[in-house]
From Swiss-Prot:
A Pfam family of this chain: HSP70
Compositionally biased intervals (Low complexity): 602-619
HAMAP family reported for this sequence: DnaK
Record PROSITE patterns: HSP70_1, HSP70_2, HSP70_3
Name assigned to this protein: Chaperone protein DnaK
Gene: dnaK
Family indicated by similarity: Belongs to the heat shock protein 70 family.
Keyword Ribonucleoprotein: no
């Protein structure tokens, strides 16, 4: 059997490693480099990847793609995609299904298709080193990648001719690389991963006993649209603004100038990690009627730090959430590992060190640790690495939409994967023959505040009073963090299932704010939940009262019937509003108005007609959650 390789598919740079004996080794590419720029160029005649693509970017900006990982699994209309549309020299377009795609030489391409070119380069690099074909790989993704982004990464692997044996989270891979040689004791490690396009924080416990190691992720958090590219963009915009002030020309309208500006900004940022001042000097950056124009701007480290200060602070918020989720304090963290090229910035290192109150580990290569960890995991899967157990988690809660537009969670965030969960739900209407299962991801109570992952129909439910059918919804997350959902009618055995392949990624605000928003809006969510509960109780009371009126027939005096119907109308009006007290008051008034109905029901029961009353008041099983599924219309079938 051939080797399984480990690939760090990065936003800015990618890296490939393989287990060589009992050590993971990073493989140098054809250019002699240990990392490969994640840049792809279409010249019209050939596809260039890595340094060759980067070298020709200035002369071919519209057909040279970089940071493509920021588009993978996302919709064109997403806010963060729209921000990139304005500053990228290449064309980002909307695909027919609304996804964010790119275009080169009038050819439309999906991000997984472009990312596959990088994976092909990694595959070839490994094959040249090993001297044998490579068909299997472990590929890393940001811990906070959602379901569709993980699926899109697997698709890229398949396009590149690789069977993706496992998708592994980048901080977890870095912890594997760090901890694999440390064979004794317990360590709680914080992995701060600020890469080219994404940010993750994972709190990981490494337990080593008698040569056996367990790597357990306690909590993870992050932002899938925060990274070195954003730091570069701050500097690019600053340089463009300075030039505009001086020359009254906006370089943002010139793709060639923007490509040169991007390269210069990235170079200046890197230089300012080792020096306190640098100069950006770009002769002949553009021209107007008066002649050629040159850009010359001095930048200090302090100026760069002021431009990106809020980005660094943004990365600290998820640290607080992750610690709280793990039920730990800063003092419980034994080691802090920095991963990702952007962590070389002194200001980033200083802020993270200050946050945790301790020195940072210096023995982890921020560019290579993730690929090495992926190679270790590949060795575990191949059986070459023994006595290592990796327990990863799902970053966001998963559930379905139920009655009152509430998200009912089946799997909580930071649950160890793989995992399964199921719950029994029922119908909202009498004789409902079909339900729609709406799958959601996020932390808020209101369905609309969470990410919709997809929906599917379960049809052929036998006619029955509402609340009687028992529909079991099961969630199954595999080791890659990809979700499979099924719904089964317990009575008929009819089932429907889906592997979630949502075409959209989480937007910047959704990803970054989901957990924090849930905490910030805790009171709002609690009130919303109480309001929905009051509405559901009121609806249930109206439904039961209508049935009792039918059963009472002529035994119910018309005067009482009119009072009850008026009370039901009041309940109906109240439930359309957002006043919980008004709904509860109207429900109580209906109960009081229905006193005569209770007397009639009791009289009928005493007269020996209890069987019919028992059937009409029969309740669903205890484990059935009152849920509302929209009935499938003809045009949805």
């Amino acid at each position: 059997m051939g080797k399984i390789i480990g690939i760090d598919l990065g936003t800015t740079n990618s890296c490939v490693a393989v287990l060589d004996g009992d050590k993971a080794r990073v493989i140098e590419n054809a250019e002699g480099d240990r990392t490969t720029p994640s840049i792809i160029a279409y010249t019209g005649e050939e596809v260039l990847v890595g340094q060759p693509a980067k070298r020709q970017a200035v002369t071919n900006p519209k057909n040279t793609f970089f940071a493509i990982k920021r588009l993978i699994g996302r919709r064109f209309k997403d806010d963060e995609v729209q921000r990139d549309v304005d500053i990228m020299p290449f064309k980002i377009i909307a695909a027919d299904n609304g996804d964010a795609w790119v275009e080169a030489h009038d050819k439309k391409m999906a991000p997984p298709q472009v990312s596959a070119e990088i994976l092909k380069k990694m595959k070839k690099t490994a094959e040249d080193y090993l001297g044998e074909p490579v068909t299997e790989a472990v590929i890393t993704v940001p811990a906070y990648f959602n379901d569709s982004q993980r699926q899109a990464t697997k698709d890229a692997g398949r396009i590149a001719g690789l069977e993706v044996k496992r998708i592994i989270n980048e901080p977890t891979a870095a912890a594997l690389a760090y901890g694999i040689d440390k064979k004794q004791g317990d360590n709680i490690v914080a992995v701060y991963d600020l890469g080219g396009g994404t940010f993750d924080i994972s709190i990981i416990e490494i337990d080593s006993v008698d040569g056996e190691q367990t790597f357990e992720v306690l909590a993870t958090n992050g932002d899938t649209h925060l990274g070195g590219e954003d730091f570069d963009n701050r500097l690019i915009n600053y340089l463009a603004d300075e030039f505009k002030k001086e020359q009254s020309l906006d370089l943002r309208n010139d793709p060639l100038a923007m490509q040169r500006l991007k390269e210069a900004a990235e170079k200046a940022k890197i230089e300012l990690s080792s020096t306190t001042q640098t100069e950006v000097n770009l002769p002949y950056i553009t021209a107007d009627a008066t002649g050629p124009k040159h850009l010359v701007v001095k930048i200090t480290r302090a100026k760069l730090e002021s431009l990106v200060e809020d980005l660094i602070q943004r990365s600290l918020e998820p640290l607080k959430v992750a610690l709280a989720d793990a039920d730990l304090s800063v003092s419980d963290i034994n080691e802090v590992i920095l991963v990702g090229g952007q962590t070389r910035m002194p200001k980033v290192r200083a802020e993270v060190s200050a946050f945790f109150g301790k020195e940072l580990r210096q023995d982890v290569n921020p560019d290579e640790a993730v690929a090495i960890g992926a190679a270790v995991q590949a060795g575990v899967l191949a059986g070459d690495v023994k006595d290592v157990l990796l327990l990863d988690v799902t970053p966001l809660s998963l559930g379905i939409e139920t009655m009152g537009s509430v998200m009912t969670k089946l799997i909580e965030k930071n649950t160890t994967i793989p995992t399964k969960a199921s719950q029994t739900f029922s119908t909202a209407d009498d004789n409902q023959s079909a339900v729609t299962i709406h799958v959601l991801q996020g932390e808020r109570k209101q369905s609309s505040a969470n990410k919709s992952l997809g929906q599917f129909n379960l049809e052929g439910i036998e006619p029955a009073p509402r609340g009687m059918p028992q529909i079991e919804v099961a969630f199954d997350i595999d080791a890659d963090g990809i979700l499979h959902v099924s719904a089964t009618d317990k009575k008929t055995g009819k089932a429907q299932n889906i592997t979630i392949k949502a075409s959209s990624g989480l937007s910047d605000e959704e990803v970054e704010a989901m957990v924090r928003d849930a905490e910030a809006h805790a009171d709002e969510d609690a009130k919303f939940e109480e309001l929905v509960s009051a509405r559901n109780q009121a609806d249930g009371m109206v439904h039961a009262t209508k049935k009792q009126i039918e059963e009472a027939g002529d035994a119910l005096p018309s005067e009482d019937k009119e009072k009850i119907e008026a009370a039901m109308a009041d309940v109906d009006t109240a439930t359309k509003g957002n006043d919980k007290e008004a709904i509860e008051k109207a429900t109580q008034a209906l109960m009081e108005a229905s006193a005569k109905l209770m007397e009639i029901a009791q009289a009928k029961a005493q007269a020996g007609q209890g069987e019919q009353a028992q059937q009409s008041n029969e309740a669903p099983a205890d484990d059935v959650v009152d849920a509302e599924f929209e009935e499938v219309k003809d045009d949805k079938k």
